[in-house]
């Protein structure tokens, strides 16, 4: 399997799929998973690409064999997992975020999970679902500095490794378009900036959320509703952001910046995305390999930094795609 590139996709309908870049078909991965799995988060162990974690409607599951089989990890019952994040320097430490805005931590590589805190924002916008943590960001140089993207509650910052949280919504309070956060990533010069995505595009803070700068996506793209945002593992100034017209639109794409957010260009040139792009994944072993998924189940990948693209057609039953990850095997 050396030298091959594998991509994993998670959907709310029909669970988890895996595909090698050059294969013609996807493999459904369900052994040991809960019935009718709803997969909303995927994280691959940075030390061993055969180990992956998926967040489901019944907690977090781990595979040690590239998804061939799974086992449920030890955590509180009834938790819907929306985000999973490894500590930047110690992969034994992991964090996850749930529906209900709870933060859990593992100190033994994901085997056992302990409740840490609940992020409370009294000004969260009331929706048909409980406020949930769609993304977790961690500063690489000061990993006790953490960030959370709340749908629909804005941004939160922790300075003590997730034990306590401060809502940092100075520019957002009261505006549902700004409070509806979908992703968070740490990057920029020296990896000291935090980027969040919402209905209006991507915003940036250089002072840990005390102030936010609108990066003016409307200057660079005619579609700016943003979902996932990710930093390249080898260059903190390079970030990718998923965009569409709105949640249910029939257009999608990926924006890229190489200067820490000052300017953005369309990365997915020549790609015909027929719904809003929800997730983007960069292969940390080969950062020129980038994949993205759309809400209605299209998956596109490039092995050469966007010069050429290949579409990986998911089975029609895989709908409401929410998560994507890729690695070398």
Question: Which sequence ranges carry the predicted segments?
Answer:
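Extracellular glycan-interacting surfaces
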Residues: 1-329
């Amino acid at each position: 399997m050396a030298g091959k590139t594998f991509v994993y996709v998670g959907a709310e309908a029909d669970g988890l799929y895996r595909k090698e870049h050059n294969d013609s078909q996807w493999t459904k991965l369900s052994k040991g998973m809960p019935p009718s799995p709803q997969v909303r988060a995927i994280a691959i162990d940075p030390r061993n690409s055969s180990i992956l974690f998926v967040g489901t409607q019944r907690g977090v599951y781990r595979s040690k064999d590239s998804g061939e089989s799974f086992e449920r990890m030890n955590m509180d019952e009834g938790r819907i997992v929306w985000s999973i994040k490894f500590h930047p320097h110690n992969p034994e430490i992991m964090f996850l975020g749930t529906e209900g805005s709870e933060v859990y931590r593992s100190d033994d590589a994901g085997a056992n999970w302990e409740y840490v805190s609940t992020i409370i924002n009294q000004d969260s916008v009331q929706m048909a679902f409980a406020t949930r943590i769609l993304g977790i960001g961690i500063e690489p140089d000061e990993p006790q500095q953490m960030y959370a993207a709340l749908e629909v509650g804005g941004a939160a910052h922790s300075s003590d490794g997730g034990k306590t949280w401060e809502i940092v919504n100075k520019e957002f309070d009261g505006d549902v378009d700004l409070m509806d956060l979908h992703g968070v990533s740490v990057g920029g010069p020296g990896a000291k900036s935090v980027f969040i995505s919402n209905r209006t595009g991507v915003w940036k803070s250089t002072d840990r959320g005390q102030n936010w700068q609108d990066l003016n996506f409307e200057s660079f793209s005619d579609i700016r509703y943003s979902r996932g945002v990710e930093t390249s593992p080898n260059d903190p100034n390079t970030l990718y952001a998923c965009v569409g017209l709105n949640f249910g639109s029939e257009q999608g794409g990926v924006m890229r910046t190489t200067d820490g957010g000052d300017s953005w260009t369309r990365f997915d040139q020549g790609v015909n995305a027929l719904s809003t792009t929800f997730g983007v994944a960069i292969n940390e072993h080969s950062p020129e390999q980038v994949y993205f998924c759309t809400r209605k189940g299209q998956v596109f990948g490039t092995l050469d930094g966007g010069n050429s693209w290949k579409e990986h057609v998911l089975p029609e039953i895989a709908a409401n795609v929410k998560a994507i990850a890729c690695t070398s095997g």
